[in-house]
Amino acid sequence: MAKEPMLQFVKMARETPEKRPRSLRSQDFHEICGRICPQDRLCEGNCVIEQSGHGTVTIGAVEKYITDTAWENGWVVPGKPAYERSESVGIIGAGPGGLAAADALRRAGLQVTVYDRYDRAGGLLTYGIPGFKLEKDVVARRVEQLEQAGVQFVLNCNVGEDLSFDAIRGQHDAVLIATGVYKQRDLAAPGVGSAGVVQALSYLTASNRRSFGDEVDDDGLDASGKRVVVIGGGDTAMDCVRTAIRQGATSVKCLYRRDRANMPGSQREVANAEEEGVEFVWLSAPRGFIAGDAVEGVIVQKMRLGEPDATGRQMPEIIEGADYVEPADLAIMALGFEPEDLPTLWGVPDLTVTRWGTIKADFRTHATSLPGVYAVGDIVRGASLVVWAIRDGRDAAQSILDYLAQPAVVAAE
């Protein structure tokens, strides 16, 4: 995945703090990966000790402990370069991919400016992932360290509206697109526009803003005292159900159209949610919503698993005549994310995209169809994991350095 030094972590955990090596690559953002990576389906899921029946090495907890110790002792320092270079890079998106690239490029001496639509850097690390999984001061201290290293942040900047893509390109020698995917999938169902039927990201963003002390226009985005139904089976759905429990919902149910074994989210997160009081309703999907002034219930259609699709995954089929109404005061749709139409939004028709709308980039160099423009993370892969975005950002930074070292680019400067 992100080339995590797992054996090194285990060895360091055995040492006293005074003997631990302080050369651990801080640009790998271990303090973040140790908290939010789904280790149960990555490194821990492939642990040979687990496969032998002795229980996995909990590398996520070890990684978190080691890096927290390093931060507490001041061993993680800003990555200031040995010498400054005149070339500059503009990065669009202050999420994990953009931050990882900014760190690597700044360490190499380049002048780095990060543009982001939000008022705080971090992207989904700040506004999407709940604070009980990723404490916001952990993200803030990483951003602060990048600022101390000389990375410039331009916030509240929506590219295509506040600043054109061409303007950014004209100001920098290279550009990295790391916007993530923010277009939320919707349902084409009766009652979907009713008050109390909300999108997952809107709900999670409101919750995170409250934790910062921001004034939030409620607009039904608080689960306190409500019967909550979350629709979806991915990691975002798990974040929603666990947030609703913490907000004091009277009941929280999660509808998923397949069974437990076929859900895309982390099984560890499902177990955590169940322990906290969430009820999972498998083989169930919404047909529509009942609403007066606001949502009152979800019309649930029961499903069964049918024949496999082209990927080998069994397709859900509707069981006719088995519909029922699940009472709800708040229905949260966590159906996944799709890429925005960046060529249209940014006025760059020559930026090539795939048939899924993601940016088409070379899988080795991350170069796009535009010279000197690179892309990483979810805007290339589709909705994926933070650890992949971090690795992409580091790898793209090296490609940008290679590009700027080319004779033609040097001559042009």
Curated annotation (Swiss-Prot):
Q: Which EC number(s) are documented for this chain? A: 1.4.1.13
Q: Which UniProt keywords apply?
A: Amino-acid biosynthesis, Glutamate biosynthesis, Iron, Iron-sulfur, Metal-binding, NADP, Oxidoreductase
Please give the coiled-coil regions recorded for this protein.
none
Q: How is the cofactor bound?
A: Binds 1 [4Fe-4S] cluster.
Q: What cofactor does its activity depend on?
A: [4Fe-4S] cluster
- Determine the domain of life of the protein's source: Bacteria
Catalyses:
2 L-glutamate + NADP(+) = L-glutamine + 2-oxoglutarate + NADPH + H(+)
**InterPro entries according to UniProt:** DPD_II (IPR028261), FAD/NAD-bd_sf (IPR036188), FAD/NAD-binding_dom (IPR023753), Helical_ferredxn (IPR009051)
The keyword Iron-sulfur is annotated on this UniProt entry:
yes
Pathway of action: Amino-acid biosynthesis; L-glutamate biosynthesis via GLT pathway; L-glutamate from 2-oxoglutarate and L-glutamine (NADP(+) route): step 1/1; Energy metabolism; nitrogen metabolism
- Entries under Pfam families matching the protein: Fer4_20, Pyr_redox_2
One Gene Ontology term of the biological-process aspect is: L-glutamate biosynthetic process
Q: Give me the residues that bind [4Fe-4S] cluster, please.
A: C33, C37, C43, C47
State one molecular function term (GO).
glutamate synthase (NADPH) activity
- Identify which top EC class this enzyme belongs to: oxidoreductase
> What quaternary arrangement does the UniProt entry report?
Aggregate of 4 catalytic active heterodimers, consisting of a large and a small subunit.
What's the further remark here? Glutamine binds to the large subunit and transfers the amido group to 2-oxo-glutamate that apparently binds to the small subunit.
Query: What is the protein name given in its UniProt record?
Result: Putative glutamate synthase [NADPH] small chain
Q: Specify the species.
A: Cereibacter sphaeroides
Q: Taxonomic classification, please?
A: Bacteria, Pseudomonadati, Pseudomonadota, Alphaproteobacteria, Rhodobacterales
Tell me what gene encodes this. Answer: gltD
